[in-house]
Amino acid sequence: MRYTPSVSGVRIPPSPQMFDKQFSRTDFDYWVTLATRWGDLDAMQHVNHAAYLTFMETARLEYYEYLGFENRNWDHKEGTILGSMTVYYHQQVLHPAQLDIGQRISKVGHKSFDILTGIFVSDKDIPALTATFTVVCFNYKKDTTIPVPDKIRDKCREL
């Protein structure tokens, strides 16, 4: 694939789409808005790939509260632990930018569920990044996995 300069001099090639679908804002149920910081940039002067993980972690913790999990779930019988993540970077983000982080439950299993996340620059309808987090339901007091609670199953809708 050949790269052609854009406004910033870098053009990022398209990445594979999860679920063979181009996501838009309507695909997400819960939103958190964050602003980029100068310290989020890398040597190429765009938001560093690792900064997105921090943005998504902040948003995911707010989403957990919305779903009914305690903020400090390690003190409770019903909590979560991150099992895995898959991240697709679709386009670069320049600073300063306001980021809208959309989330939704996209899949529910017996002891885990997936959270689909999209990061959108505030004036764009196509995400700059999409990610799937597999979250395992976990009892921290007993140090063991537990079944997914019904409150999570009730929040899942078809893509």
Identify the role of each PLM range.
Residues 18-32, 93-95, 105-159:
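HotDog/MaoC-like acyl-thioester-processing domains
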Residues 18-66:
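Catalytic strand-loop segment that frames the active site of acyl-thioester-processing enzymes
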Residues 34-38, 89, 137:
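Hydrophobic residues in beta-strands and at strand termini
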Residues 63-113, 128-131, 136:
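Hydrophobic beta-strand-centered segment that forms part of the acyl-chain substrate-binding groove
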